Amino acid sequence: MSESVIQGSNPDRVLSPTSSKSVTQTVNGSHQFVIQGYSLAKGMGIGKHIASDNFSVGGYQWGIFFYPDGKNPEDNSSYVSVFIALASEGTEVRALFELALVDQSGKGKHKVHSHFERSLDGGPYTLKYRGSMWGYKRFFRRSILETSDYLKDDCLIINCTVGVVVSEILCPQLHSVHVPDSELGSHFGVLLDSMEGSDITFNIAGEKFLAHKLVLAARSPFFKSKFFSEFEANNTEVTINDLEPKVFKALLQFMYKDSLPEDVEPATAHTFERLKLSEIYETLIVKVLAAADKYDLIRLRLLCESHICKGVSVKSVAKILALADRYNAKELKGVCLKFTAENLAAVLETDAYQQMKDECVTLQSELLKAVAGHEEGSNSTGGAKSQSVWAQLSDGGGDTTSRHVRQRTT
């Protein structure tokens, strides 16, 4: 005798609950419509409009229609009309709208009709076909408009915002595939360390470095033009006399691994305050900065600038400004000029500034401009202290252009 057992449902088994969430929101976009020559547009006729260029919001095309003589006969005598029109074929769209006539006096008193940030009893407006519109037949009384700050130099400006309603169901992502970080740098790093397949040798002060032409050409426009030119393409050895081996090694580190070498000096304010400018020029990071500028390695130059920027202080900024100017470090130079302008009185008292003033005469005029821009941006009221600082900067620079800069007074 045999017995068969049919497995049924297990009432004691509890399944894990599932969940989902419906999210409805708007995808917003804006368009500005400038109407130049309003007085010439008047009289074009009832129901005739000036249309903006089409613009895209939420995957649909839209347009703004301005009716200088009104959209309907009953509105012609008193009002201009403004509408937003659906310019896409096909499906119906639910959306929120805002129309704003810009106050051109600068007072910010715009004439705004908006669905946003207020409760709508009937929900968003539905446009069902191309050419369907939302707007106002009586948008603005014409007689008031023509004597208002909304009309300036015969020009009107209308800002339009459209918020297309979209819904989606969000479910927990139970499964995923992990993608590790890019290994490109590490793979090229292995290539640098092994130099397998190298096809170019660099002789740097008697020390030999192997490399790959394609890697260097991809990283540096200088090397690309060097290796792919008609006269240099077949060269397998290059001698460079104006670089130290450790600097060229740093260039290779960057071109293969996209990073600075680990033996670059820490950049601290104390380091740059302690060293003389001539000693700063001999540091590895500054030599790498100079080489990056020469060999058109823009990202390496920015890495160096970012590293050196950590050392900016009242006592060091003049030195760093001088080296930034010397090696075309524009971002670093901008930081130094801004820092100096913000801390002008203290910087002018430092020995480093006095040395920079004598050795980098052309920087004086740039510093004057930076200070002027800073004071204008902060709405400075001047005062005796501010004026004395200006006098010290203007008269003590040694720059013939700065001697003619007139001191600003308030």
UniProtKB/Swiss-Prot annotation:
Q: Transmembrane stretches, by residue range?
A: none
List the keywords (alphabetical). Answer: Cytoplasm, Nucleus, Ubl conjugation pathway
Write down the Pfam families for this protein, in alphabetical order: BACK_BPM_SPOP, BTB, MATH_2
Q: Where is this region: Disordered?
A: 1-24
Tissue expression as described in the entry: Ubiquitous.
Ranges of residues in domain MATH: 28-162
Cellular component GO terms, alphabetical: cytosol; nucleus
Extract the PROSITE patterns matched here: BTB, MATH
Matching InterPro entries: BACK_BPM_SPOP, BPM1-6, BPM_C, BTB/POZ_dom, MATH/TRAF_dom, SKP1/BTB/POZ_sf, TRAF-like
Q: What does UniProt give as the signal peptide span?
A: none
| The protein's annotated pathway | Protein modification; protein ubiquitination
User: Biological process (GO) annotations?
Assistant: cellular response to salt stress; cellular response to water deprivation; protein ubiquitination; response to osmotic stress
Location in the cell reads:
Nucleus; Cytoplasm
The protein's induction, as recorded, is:
By drought.
| Family affiliation | Belongs to the Tdpoz family.
Assembly and partners?
Heterodimer with BPM1 and BPM3. Interacts with RAP2-4. Binds to MYB56 at the promoter of FLOWERING LOCUS T (FT).
Give the domain note.
The BTB/POZ domain mediates the interaction with some component of ubiquitin ligase complexes.
Tell me the protein's name. BTB/POZ and MATH domain-containing protein 5
Q: What is the lineage of its organism?
A: Eukaryota, Viridiplantae, Streptophyta, Embryophyta, Tracheophyta
**UniProt gene name:** BPM5
